[in-house]
């Protein structure tokens, strides 16, 4: 009996000392975002500019330190050239709004990056970006139309098994803006939805009008594979305080990690567009 106990203790000691560290290293090495380089783009055109942008950037930089990836932050559209974009595994547009490119050559470089297999994470008012560029609006999944006033309401987790929903509540009650859009693209897969019945009633007429054919649930977070690339969008994150909230930080982190998991490599042989307005691939 004593020998048996010694054997079990030795086996346990072996697992803790030798096997556990190896397993931990394997987990770290296979974290897809580790050692990646991201472009965080913050440009806004004429119009409303969110005061959350610096806080969003700081939050992503802190996540980069914690999870071993790097970020380049820019509000200069000159970064959108083929040679420059090749440096990045995916792009993050955080609360961009209105026209964020200066030239159609920059728009074409962005489009070809997506076609080559690049990834895109869009945060909050990204749905109000490049409102006159049809291809971009399809890539995003919608274009902004209106939001209810800032208030506490509920967002429902529609796909809790999706990798980017890890640690996200089944029903998330938070203060934010409930975004609505138009020109919704049918390729998006909804991950979270605004629970419209949880909104304050004084704007109910405008809410019903903007919800269109949707009833009580309206898309808030979604993803899609689009034209060879990969897209993850959250309309949440209006307040600057959001970016220091642990639940929201995790929400953003899981979106970044999901996009990292989709990256293979850029292959510009698949980038066929010669104009920003070329038809979609057949």
Please describe what each predicted stretch is.
Residues 142, 147-227:
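Catalytic beta-strand/loop cores that center a nucleophilic Ser/Cys/Thr
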């Amino acid at each position: 009996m004593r020998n048996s106990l010694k054997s079990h203790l030795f086996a346990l000691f072996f697992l803790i000392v030798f096997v556990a560290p190896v397993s931990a290293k394997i987990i770290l090495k296979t974290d897809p975002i580790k050692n990646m380089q991201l472009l965080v783009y913050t440009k806004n055109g004429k119009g409303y500019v969110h005061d959350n942008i610096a806080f969003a950037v700081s939050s992503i930089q802190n996540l980069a330190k914690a999870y071993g990836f790097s970020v380049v932050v820019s509000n200069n559209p000159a970064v959108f050239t083929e040679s420059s974009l090749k440096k990045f595994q995916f792009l993050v547009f955080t609360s961009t709004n209105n026209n964020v490119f200066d030239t159609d050559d920059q728009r074409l470089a962005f489009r070809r990056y997506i076609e080559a297999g690049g990834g895109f994470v869009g945060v909050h008012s990204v749905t109000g970006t490049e409102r006159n560029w049809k291809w971009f609006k399809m890539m995003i999944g919608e274009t902004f139309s209106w939001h209810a006033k800032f208030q506490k309401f509920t967002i429902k987790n529609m796909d809790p098994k999706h990798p980017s929903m890890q640690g996200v509540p089944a029903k998330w009650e938070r203060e934010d803006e409930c975004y609505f859009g138009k020109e919704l693209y049918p390729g998006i897969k909804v991950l979270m939805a605004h629970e419209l019945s949880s909104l304050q009633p004084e704007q109910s007429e405008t809410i019903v009008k903007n919800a269109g054919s949707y009833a009580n649930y309206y898309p808030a977070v979604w993803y899609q594979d689009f034209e060879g690339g990969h897209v993850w969008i959250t309309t949440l994150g209006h307040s600057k305080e959001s970016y220091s909230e642990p639940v929201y930080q995790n929400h953003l982190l899981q979106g970044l990690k999901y996009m990292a998991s989709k990256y293979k490599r850029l292959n510009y042989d698949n980038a066929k567009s010669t104009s920003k307005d070329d038809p979609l691939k057949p």
